[in-house]
Structures are given as C-alpha cells and as structure tokens.
A protein has these predicted regions:
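N-terminal compositionally biased, intrinsically disordered segments and leader/signal-like regions
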Residues: 14-17, 207-208, 431, 435
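Beta-propeller fold recognition
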Residues: 19-259, 263-412
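Positively charged, low-complexity intrinsically disordered regions
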Residues: 3, 13, 85-87, 109, ...
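C-terminal outer-membrane/trafficking sorting elements
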Residues: 418-425, 429-499
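Bacterial Sec-dependent N-terminal signal peptides
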Residues: 1-23, 230, 271, 411-413, ...
Length: 499
C-alpha cells in the first residue's frame, strides 16, 4: 500500500520535477568547467575571482543555471565587509539583488540547493566564521528576468555564532527534502547542527552530540559519501579524522569511529577530502610542508596508519590543495600557489605557472594505491587559474532511499513556513476547509485540486477559483488526507486533518 501511495504522488508531481546536476564547476580566477560522462566537455570564462567558497547548479542537460562565490578581489581588499558573497546568473552577470550575500573568504561556506517541489526556486546557504558570524540563506527565483533570476529573499539568518568552515547538505531519504549540516566553532565540543529544508521552508535547528569532544576551530570539514550513508569529519586544527554513519530519514548520526586521533601537534595538517564513487577510498590533502595527497582504505581496520602516499610536494609555494569528486567519476585537485610562500591571493597578473593553471587528476579513484592513476597537473585550464577552493557542491542526483521508512515523502521535524502560495484554514477542521490563494496575480485563474485518503485513494477532485474556495469533507471519516493543488509550475501538497 505504501508503494501505491508513492506511485500516486509521483503521478501528481512528475511533470514539475526537474533533475538538477553538478555538470558545471565555477571556481578560482574566472574558471568554468563543463563535464560530460567521460571527461571534460569545455572550459570557459566565468565571473568568479575567489580563492575559496563557490557553488554551482545546472539543469539535467548540463546547462548552467547560476552560481555563487565568496568575495572577489574588490571586496576581499575591504576587510571591514562581512556580506561579501555574490550570486551570478547563467550569463555571468551579477544576478538581480545578488550582491552582499553573507559570506567571507574561506572554502566550504556556500551551498546551492533546489527548493523542494519547485522547478525554478533555489536556496543559497552561506556561512561566516569570525565573530559576529552566522549561517543564513538567500532564495533565488529563476522565474524573474526571463530566466536570469532574482534573489527574492536575502541573508535570512538561520543560526548565529561562529560557523566552522565546512557546511554540507544531504538529500533526505524521501528524495525531495534536504538536511543542512554544520558544526560551530567552540573550543571543545562534539555537537552537530542540522536544519531540514522542505517545500514549506526551513525547520528549527536540531543538535546531536556524538563522538569524542575535540577542539573545533574555524575549520571542520563535513564530507558526505556519494550515497549519503556516511560522513567523514576532518578537523584541520588538531588532526582528528572521524567517520559517522548517517540516517537520511531521521538525520541522525551513529556508529562513530576515529580514523586518526586528535593531537596538540598533529603530524599532518589534514585539510580537505573526498570519497571515491565506490565509497571504499578516502582521499585526503594536507596543509603542511611537504604537502601530501593520501589514499585511505576505509575497509582497513587501521585505515589511517596504513595510508598510501599518492603524491607529495615539498615547496613553500604549495601550502595546500582542495579535492573533489567530479561528475565524470574522476577526482580533481586544486594546487594552490603562493608567490614566495606569502602572497596566495590575489595572484599578480604576471603569475601564470603550471601549478595554478592546471588541476591534478585522479583518473580511477576506485582503484587501490597507485592504480588510481594519478596525474599531477594533468588538466590544463586553458589559461584560467585555480586557487585552493573548489565547488562545495552536493549530490543533486541522490534519489529516495528505496524501501526505507521515509520513502513516501513523510518527514518529522516542525517546519517554518516560507512563501507558500496556498494557505488552508482551519486545519484541523470538522470538515469545512477554506483554501486561500495568497498571490493576487493568481486569482484570475482556476487550479485543479485532488484529495487522497491515507490509503492513496482519490476521494475528491475539483477546481479552486478566485482568492478563496471551500472544500467540504464533512461526510468523510476523521483522519489525515492529502490535498494536491496543481499550480502552473509546481504541485503544492498540504496535509488536511479532519476531526
């Protein structure tokens, strides 16, 4: 019966669903990459000029929709500014109202997520680390400006306090909603913070304490596996490397294990990481001299102690590197460059060297040891340059967790309403519900609605006209019902409680 309900819901919403992808990356000094299944389709110029945080989203065909980045050079040179981020449209111009986004100049401060059950609405989550910091969201609507978009809500604060650089998100087990996950900068803690994004908005914050408390400073990487079944935690400050199982239905962390213990003087400044497509191998970069690229076999009970050195660079000009799994199944490593070990950003116009004009490539990251086929500086960027940061993109292709308790689009956190076009009241009701269409421009149209029982049976269908309409369930049994209202570009689903 659960599958029947899911099937009916899918029939109602399939035409509004859009499969978004990570097929474009925008990063560094003006660099954009479009991927295909086998490699790289093209390399092109963008408006990004940032050493760190960036995020990109594309449609199912690989067409760029928009992107966001931490401060460009002009804003970076104004240290007093804290709202430095920018959002750019697909034509590489600043999006309407896309300036002054809360953000600084770190490396994993930004995320782009599709707004659940919407085709053209998105949320840009951004964070800041230093005193006065916060995590916030800005809502993007691509219905504006002929598809170029507009930021319709900006810098809506979700939480205050110093947010550790390393926010991430994993799709809920229902295949629609998103868990936003982050840690805070406290001297010693093991607290993880979670916010759920649903069609109705963003939930209140929930927290979980798990693992061994350790010093958490301005950097703490949360790196999900491709399936979202586990998360790697990297603490550059004290060298802690840990692994957690993750429940996509409940958002709970469990099965904590320590891969490398904290130390007041860690041997390696663990910096960034990514898991292979088969989720067996973890690749870690360091912020040290020499700088290392390690492969760690997560099936090995002594994984970190038996790590394999894939590459090392013994130079003050190379202080660290970012690493990401790309849509083509390869991994790419940004090789940061610092002139004379000091001037890492911005590059002088004359500084075009192999390290900052190439990405290194792990061609077969699913393979053990040197069979991963690593090629240092193996991908030329066609004259564009890279800094330390690579896109902090999430797995947009992750679907429902089949067979789980939540694959029927049910969630359990209280939700905060955010720009829902339809309001139903009273709800609960003894049977007479009033439906209010909130946007005046929509009052001239009629919209089809359908009501399903909890067993998935269609019990009523009709049309909503004007500002308000009535739905009568007086003669139906008490219980929960699902109201689906078909709007031009989305299906709104509201649970009705009949007393």
């Amino acid at each position: 019966m659960r599958k029947l309900i899911l099937f009916i819901l899918l029939l109602q919403t399939v035409f509004t669903k859009a499969q978004f992808t990570n097929l474009n990356w925008t990063f560094g000094d003006s660099c954009g990459i479009k991927f295909n299944a086998n490699g790289i389709d093209s390399i092109y110029r963008t408006s990004v000029n940032a050493r760190g945080s960036c995020a990109t989203i594309s449609d199912s065909l690989g067409n760029l929709l928009f992107y966001a980045a931490s401060p460009d050079l002009e804003l970076y040179q104004t240290p007093s500014l804290i709202d430095r981020g920018r959002i750019y449209n697909k034509q590489h111009d600043k999006m309407d109202n896309g300036d002054t986004i809360f953000c600084q100049n770190w490396y994993r401060e930004m995320l782009i997520l599709p707004w659940p059950d919407s085709v053209n609405k998105f949320v840009v989550v951004s964070s800041m680390t230093t005193p006065g910091a916060k995590i916030s969201y800005s809502k993007v609507d691509l219905d504006y400006n002929n598809g170029l978009g507009k930021v319709v809500n900006k810098n809506v604060v979700l939480d205050t306090g110093e947010i550790s650089d390393g926010i991430t998100a994993i799709k809920h087990g229902n295949g629609r909603d998103w868990w936003i996950i982050y840690k805070k900068w406290f001297y010693t803690n093991n607290t993880i913070y979670k916010i759920l994004l649903t069609p109705n908005g963003l939930s209140s914050i929930t927290t979980q304490s798990i693992g061994v408390p350790s010093f958490v400073g301005s950097f703490y990487r949360l790196i999900p596996s491709k399936s979202g079944e586990f998360i790697i935690g990297i603490n550059p400050g004290d060298g802690t490397l840990e692994k957690f199982s993750f429940d996509r239905c409940t958002g709970n962390f469990s099965n904590h294990s320590i891969l490398n213990n904290a130390s007041p003087n860690p041997a390696y400044g663990l910096w960034d990481g990514a898991t292979s497509l088969n989720e067996r191998f973890l690749y870690i970069t360091t912020l040290s001299t020499p700088e290392y690229l390690f492969q760690i076999d997560l099936l090995n009970p002594n994984a970190f102690q038996n790590k394999i050195v894939i590459d090392s660079i013994d130079s003050l000009n190379n202080p660290g590197s970012g690493i990401r799994l790309a849509p083509n199944g390869k991994m790419y490593r940004s090789n940061s460059w610092c002139q004379n070990g000091l001037y890492c950003y911005p590059f002088l116009d004359s500084v075009f060297v192999p390290v900052n004009t190439h990405l290194s490539v792990i061609n077969e990251p699913d393979n053990f040891s040197l069979a991963c086929n690593y090629i240092g500086l193996g991908q030329y960027l066609n004259g564009f340059r890279t800094y330390l940061g690579l896109p902090n993109d999430v797995n947009l292709a992750l679907g429902p967790l089949s067979g789980s308790m939540c694959d029927t689009l049910s969630v359990g956190l209280s939700e905060v309403k955010d720009d829902i076009p339809i309001q139903v009241f009273p709800n609960p009701s003894t049977g007479n519900f009033t439906v209010n269409i909130k946007h005046e421009a929509m009052h001239m149209y009629g919209f089809t609605y359908s009501i399903y029982s909890i067993q998935g049976l269609l019990i009523q269908r009709g049309e909503l006209k004007g500002k308000t309409s009535s739905i009568n369930l007086t003669f139906f049994e008490s219980g929960m019902y699902l109201l689906n209202v078909t709007l031009p570009k989305q299906v709104v689903q509201i649970k009705l409680s009949k007393l």
